[in-house]
């Protein structure tokens, strides 16, 4: 479990790095400039990429674990978790700011 959480943290750091070099204008952790709808769009996009991979794996061979496909699916799931974590960060920051 710890390894997975570390990978999610690394993905969050990667997202923030991409923001810092101008690839993104915001991340889901941004407290302004990004609506809840936009955050949901980002999360949904990541989910759909993972869903597409999972469905492709099922079509190719039910019950057969293709290592490359599983590795790619795992990568997408870590990205989903990181986007969700970023959104939680934004919510926490906004709650803290409203308290004080």
Model-assigned labels for residue ranges:
Residues 1-100:
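Flexible "arm" and connector segments at domain edges
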């Amino acid at each position: 479990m710890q390894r997975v959480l570390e990978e999610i943290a690394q993905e969050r750091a990667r997202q923030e790095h991409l923001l810092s070099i101008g690839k993104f204008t915001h991340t889901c952790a941004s407290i302004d400039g990004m609506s809840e709808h936009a955050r949901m769009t980002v999360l949904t996009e990541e989910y759909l990429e993972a869903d597409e991979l999972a469905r492709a794996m099922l079509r190719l061979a039910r019950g057969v674990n293709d290592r490359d496909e599983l590795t790619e699916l795992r990568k997408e799931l870590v990205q989903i978790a990181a986007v969700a974590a970023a959104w939680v960060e934004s919510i926490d920051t906004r709650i803290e700011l409203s308290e004080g």
